[in-house]
Each structure stands twice: as structure tokens, then as C-alpha cells.
């Protein structure tokens, strides 16, 4: 790929990253950052696998941020990796999603290192934001 294309893509996704980091999500951009986080992670963690697609922009990111900001029970940690952008970090995080097919966007609620709830792309695409938020908040209420 050309350097101009890579720079264009880096700039294009800045607001997509900020939508989550601005709501308090920690962005993990390397495999090492994922490993370091997962080694020390305690309690519950919501992981958002971010994406450039429309269902990430219109549904996944807003549902994740609003669920975390509005629900009484929330995860101890909120982190994000960006599929297609931070490939090694995303691949490393997906290693922890045992039994789940790679999907972006997607969301995983972990207790320690174990996935206790997973929302793949097909449960995001074609659903409205409120449905996705209810899916997340029900998981928060059950596990956080």
C-alpha cells in the first residue's frame, strides 16, 4: 500500500477512535498492549472491536458508549481495538474470545479473561441502537 493511502486511513479513523476514547475507553493499539492489559485485568471488561463500517458508526459505538454512560451497573474496564487498523492488537484480543468467530464490529464482556457475553456483527447490523443497548445493559446487570 502507498504511504499516502495509509496516512489517509489513519486520519480517516481519528474521529471513529475518539468516539470511544472520549467516553473513557482505553485504546489498545498493539499486541503487547493487549497482552499487558489482559495480564492485569481484574473484574469485568467491555471490549469493543471497532470498525470503519456504517453499523459501527451508527450503532455499535453509540450503543456501547451510551450503555456505559447510562447504566447503573457497568464494567470495571472499557477497552477497544480497531479491526483493519491495528491488526496485531485485534488478532491478539480475538485470541481471548474463545469459541467466537472474528467479527467487526463486535463487543465482548469479559470476567477476568473469560467471555461471558458476546455481541457479533449480525446482532448489531439490522438492529436499532436501543436494542443493542438493552443487550449490553442486560449483560452488565447480570455480570457487573
Swiss-Prot record:
Signal peptide: none
This protein's record includes keyword Nucleus: no
Induction statement: Expression is up-regulated by cumene hydroperoxide (CHP).
Traits of the deletion mutant: Mild sensitivity to cumene hydroperoxide (CHP) as indicated by growth inhibition assay. No effect on growth after NaOCl treatment.
Disulfide bridge map: 53-55
PTM comment, free text: N-terminal Cys of the CXC active site motif can react with bacillithiol (BSH) to form mixed disulfides. S-bacillithiolation protects Cys residues against overoxidation by acting as a redox switch in response to oxidative stress.
Keywords: Disulfide bond, Oxidoreductase, Redox-active center
Family: Belongs to the bacilliredoxin family.
Function: S-bacillithiolation is the formation of mixed disulfide bonds between protein thiols and the general thiol reductant bacillithiol (BSH) under oxidative stress. BSH is an equivalent of glutathione (GSH) in Firmicutes. This protein is a dithiol bacilliredoxin, which debacillithiolates (removes BSH) the S-bacillithiolated OhrR (OhrR-SSB) in vitro and in vivo NaOCl-generated S-bacillithiolated MetE (MetE-SSB). Involved in maintaining redox homeostasis in response to disulfide stress conditions. Has a redox potential of -130 mV. Displays weak protein disulfide isomerase activity in vitro.
Protein name as catalogued: Bacilliredoxin BrxA
Annotated source species: Bacillus subtilis (strain 168)
